[in-house]
Amino acid sequence: MFDTKRLTTLPDAPGVYLMKGNGGDILYVGKAKSLRKRVRSYFSKGGESRYHIRFLVGRVADIDVIVTDTEKEALLLENTLIKEHRPRYNLDLRDDKTYFSLRLDMNEEFPRLTIVRRPGRDGARYFGPYSSASAAREVLKQLYKLFPLRHYPLESCRRRRRPCLFYQLRQCAAPCHGLISGEDYQSLAEGAALFLAGKNSDLTRLYRQRMAAAAADERYEDAARYRDLIRAIEVTVEKQKMVAGDGDTDVVGFFRDATDLSVSILFYRGGRLMGSRNYLLDWEMDDAEGLSSFLSGYYNRDVVIPDEILIPFTVDDTDPLGELLTERRGKKTVLRHPVRGTKAELVRLAARNAEAYLHEKREKDSGMEQVLGELKEKLHLTNLPRRIECYDISTIQGRYSVGSRVRFQNGAPDKAGYRRYRIRTVPGTDDFAMMHEVLSRRFRDGHGGDGRPDLIVIDGGMGQLNVLTAILEELGLHGIDAVSLAKSRVERNMSDNEVVRSDERVFLPGRRNPVVLRQNGAPLLLLARIRDEAHRFAITYHQKLRGKGSIRSSLEGIPGIGEKRKRELLKRFGSIRALRQADREQLAAVPSVSPALADAIWKALHGEEPEAP
């Protein structure tokens, strides 16, 4: 129990407080404009009827405070400490989707658009977010018809003897082959940036000016090109409705019922709705502190920061958060709580989205709860398998051997729990020993600092399962369920040319005969999906290592090629195919590769006996 006499000694200054349990574990990290007032509010006599105060008073044994000079410093420190300690009762900002952005670096030679998972802090411009890679690719596909920017890395383009197919389709201006001037290409890139930012009126105004200038200079082909661009842009955007001005705005909606809290963010770019992002939050504090913690955590990650953030109610740290985001973005960002007008309607719309997401998620989870309950019953599990981990091994004749781990939480992939393991200690093709190494590395300190799964699934039969159970016993990890999933087998009866496929089987510890689940039932489909995902994850890593190794093996025996030059060639060309396509001049362009050595490399890659350079 926390000694409330300490409350009078707390400083009346901005800073961060860390609430700790009996074992010294950090339960919650918060920030405050005044540490004394904020922490005292949790223990005030008039507040004990509120759940979050009863919750804290009952569990907090000690509170540490760190004083900062400003609220903005407190905000930064809070985020750092949350990332470091991951307290049980702070928000965990995970959603069930991966989002993508388009990246455009105007400082590149001939700027190119690429799809990235996370915006970086590298001076490039980022547009989005998009809910899937396919959505981002569709935007690119349509964009290239208006703005034919290059599709491939410059090194790849310049190795080609002629422009790529996209040039023939008029979806690439082929700058790498000198078919467009640098000035005109830069104009295309600037136009693409304006279009993606929703600045269509600015873009058409700019192109009208250039069309008029080209016509005045009797450059009629250029004038016609600008005319066609203006028409195409107007046709593209004429059906889009502008509802949020012409800037970039994030609208935050907030919904709470008796048991759950959800947040929805609507992304408006150039005044048009581009997409949304939803979160279901495990939060036991009051709404204002919940929203404050959410905003702080979300916008201190690698996300696109807009001009304006609309929020459903005011929070204490609106001003310092706005200052911090302005500093990170390099442009002014403001947080507003609109109470009337169009922007207030947008906030209410976001709240309705948050409510709809909560009901949809709850309905989906209830269905998955039934599937997990059926798995527990059919496989005689100790635990309801909310967190399932699956392991797989990938190797070819003992070379480039790797292991993988995937994690599913409540029936959905939890990408933060995916891990790859390069096999270090096992020579040859001993799959059992490789699995032993992977599992030992995972659980070497009891739970690997990554929490305990309810159920472990491995691909294979009774042999693989025996390895797993032996490791769990060896490490003293009791109470974790384990099963192995054996793929169906195909058998051919040669006499009547009949093909028979056996059922997939689940092996359990201490039981000789496997359990056969209904083949199209949801429990087996879930296990098979997890098993296949672990296999995909392992084989992707294996192929990556094998691709790197193929370059190295192709260069073995060439005089003058050591590990350093192998790394440089691998970095420059990326694959053995690209390396073989390179001519002598391109090979000699690699640092530390002389013309004579380039000739030796080229001969070795094309089946000729290399000579000492």
Swiss-Prot record:
Q: Which UniProt keywords apply?
A: Cytoplasm, DNA damage, DNA excision, DNA repair, Excision nuclease, SOS response
- The principal localisation class reads cytoplasm
In this chain the UVR domain maps to: 201-236
**What CDD domains does this protein's entry cite?**
GIY-YIG_UvrC_Cho
Q: What highest taxon heads this organism's lineage?
A: Bacteria
Q: Which Gene3D superfamilies match?
A: 5' to 3' exonuclease, C-terminal subdomain (1.10.150.20), GIY-YIG endonuclease (3.40.1440.10), UvrC, RNAse H endonuclease domain (3.30.420.340)
Which Pfam family, any one of them, does this sequence belong to?
UvrC_RNaseH_dom
- InterPro entries under this entry? GIY-YIG_endonuc, GIY-YIG_endonuc_sf, GIY-YIG_UvrC_Cho, RuvA_2-like, UVR_dom, UVR_dom_sf, UvrABC_protein_C, UvrC
Any one GO MF annotation of this record? DNA binding
Q: Does the keyword Amino-acid biosynthesis apply?
A: no
Quaternary form?
Interacts with UvrB in an incision complex.
Name the NCBIfam families for this protein. Answer: PRK00558.1-5, uvrC
PANTHER family tied to this protein: UVRABC SYSTEM PROTEIN C, UVRC/OXIDOREDUCTASE
The name on file for this protein is UvrABC system protein C
Phylogenetic lineage: Bacteria, Pseudomonadati, Thermodesulfobacteriota, Desulfuromonadia, Geobacterales
